[in-house]
Amino acid sequence: KVLLKSRPFEKEYSLYIGIPFCPTTCLYCSFTSFPVSRFGDRMRAYLDALYKELAFVAKHHRDKKLTTIYIGGGTPTALDEECLSKLMNMIHELFPVEESEEFTVESGRPDSITKEKFRILKEAGVTRISINPQTMHQETLDLIGRAHTVEQTKEAFLLARECGFDNINMDIITGLPG
């Protein structure tokens, strides 16, 4: 009760944006996601539809404070650089990003991360990223259909630091096969 009373929920909101694309579909995943190899040609159409929905949300929340933005998925960094940049521009056009307390992007899989994508996110004001290896055991990564290595995870983390990110989450799942 104390926590609920500490925030003026009637006057603020958080924004979640789902990006339903991934490099591949992982064995354990229950989220709606579409492999880029089969559905990548639909990214631009998805962003066009997403713009309409975000514009609707922005219009109906003008009188409230945007406290947090969270972009998840899927794997948002499965978007190519052009689409990722377009997404960031849409958000900035429609929402007062600079007023938010936190702006998180699930960078997700190390095999979808590039220096250019991190640059786009950093310039857009992203304050927190997630790099999600799910495990640091190569055998398990292979069994669950993750097309990246443990070494790529380490490299992605160091690249994030190099690009100026100091709030980095890393998801590890226990109980995976292997």
Can you name each region flagged by the protein language model?
Residues 7-9, 20, 63, 97:
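Short, flexible hinge/linker loops that cap or flank conserved catalytic cores
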Residues 33-178:
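Conserved non-cysteine loop/helix-boundary elements of the Radical SAM core domain that shape
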Residues 14, 21-24, 39, 150:
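Short linear sequence motifs
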Residues 15-16, 72:
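Short, well-ordered beta-strand segments
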Residues 18-33:
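Local cysteine-cluster metal-coordination motifs and their immediate loop/turn environment
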Residues 1-15:
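N-terminal [4Fe-4S]-dependent radical SAM core
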Residues 12-14, 26, 102:
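Structural motif
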